[in-house]
Amino acid sequence: MIPGGLSEAKPATPEIQEIANEVKPQLEEKTNETYQKFEAIEYKTQVVAGINYYIKVQVDDNRYIHIKVFKGLPVQDSSLTLTGYQTGKSEDDELTGF
């Protein structure tokens, strides 16, 4: 993978679901919504001074949100931070850098 470039989209794994679950409260606070369903569908990664995870999350039958989560390097602060999100997405919308 090229540093700074986005990886290919991959199906979400249990680890990616855990990442999404950890930042769910941050997203709910920012959007002022509560999500009963919060299922990670696919993801891309971007290597920076840590890793950006771009995750497509299904929040309702036909509603999707793209979230961007930053994880710092282990020698730094490796906590997960929601750094961006895009609402109003569909199942077919491609994950892109934002």
From Swiss-Prot:
The record marks 4 as: Reactive site. CDD domains: CY. GO terms for cellular component: cornified envelope; cytosol; extracellular space; nucleoplasm; peptidase inhibitor complex. This is Cystatin-A. A motif (Secondary area of contact) lies at residues 46-50. SUPFAM superfamilies: Cystatin/monellin. The gene is CSTA. It is found in: Cytoplasm. PROSITE patterns: CYSTATIN.
